[in-house]
């Protein structure tokens, strides 16, 4: 009888331990620039906190870590990748390239940096990734635009990453650029306002939920 009670106690303890392990949220690091960091917005209104609220409201057990740094290029993201991965990380959102565009950096340079990031995150560490791109403006010329826009598709395919082709794409869905800029952008015309971030999160939220599901044990 004593052995039976001990066995029951061990089984209960094991069950509690397993339940505790399952209760740990999936940690998703959002590696990006000012669009990720929430530039120009009060606390709680940027991309990461609004995304966290979206997931919480739908019962998605995840913690989104804001690893966005304003002004960061793909090279900057690569340089601090080890820091971003230093904790217990289960998945990553990679949203870099906007500042490469603003500086007119060669797409081949941006591509090499993103390739190195994804090689470490998805390749070496085997973590699921959501890659969020941007689209180059037409005034950079067709060759530049084709190379820049295409690198996100190519890299997502290479590393089996989920892909959203443009961080700002949801803002112009169903409307024109002038209307979207007036309604959803801050005065600088580069960064989304609170309402713009909300639109972006509504569009990307389901993809992040899928990412969490892929990362869950």
Model-derived features: positions:
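Serine-esterase "nucleophile elbow" of acetyl-processing enzymes
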Residues: 22-70, 78-89
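Short histidine/acidic/glycine/proline-rich micro-motifs that form metal-
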Residues: 35-38, 42, 68-72, 99-102, ...
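Alpha-helical cap/lid subdomain in secreted, periplasmic
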Residues: 60, 76-217
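Short gly/ser/thr-rich secondary-structure transition/capping motifs
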Residues: 11, 75-76
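Bacterial N-terminal signal peptides that target proteins for export
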Residues: 1-10
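N-terminal signal peptide c-region/cleavage motif recognized by signal peptidases
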Residues: 18-20
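Flexible, glycine- and charge-enriched loops at secondary-structure boundaries
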Residues: 6, 41-44, 70, 107, ...
């Amino acid at each position: 009888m004593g052995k039976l009670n001990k066995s029951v106690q061990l089984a209960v303890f094991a069950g509690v331990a397993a339940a505790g392990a399952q209760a740990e949220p999936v940690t998703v690091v959002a590696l990006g620039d000012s669009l990720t960091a929430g530039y120009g917005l009060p606390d709680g209104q940027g991309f990461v906190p609004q995304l966290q609220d979206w997931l919480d409201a739908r019962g998605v057990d995840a913690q989104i870590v804001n690893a966005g740094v304003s002004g960061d290029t793909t090279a900057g993201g690569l340089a601090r990748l080890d820091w971003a991965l230093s904790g217990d990380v289960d998945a990553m959102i990679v949203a870099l390239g906007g500042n490469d565009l603003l500086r007119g950096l060669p797409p081949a340079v941006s591509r090499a940096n993103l390739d190195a990031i994804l090689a470490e995150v998805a390749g070496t560490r085997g973590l699921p990734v959501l890659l969020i791109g941007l689209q180059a403006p037409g005034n950079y010329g067709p060759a530049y635009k084709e190379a820049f826009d295409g690198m996100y598709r190519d890299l997502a395919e290479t590393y089996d990453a989920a892909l959203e082709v443009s961080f700002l794409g949801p803002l112009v869905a169903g409307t024109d650029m002038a209307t979207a800029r007036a309604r959803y952008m801050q005065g600088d015309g580069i960064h989304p306002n609170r309402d713009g971030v909300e639109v972006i999160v509504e569009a990307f939220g389901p993809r992040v939920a899928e990412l969490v599901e892929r990362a869950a044990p």
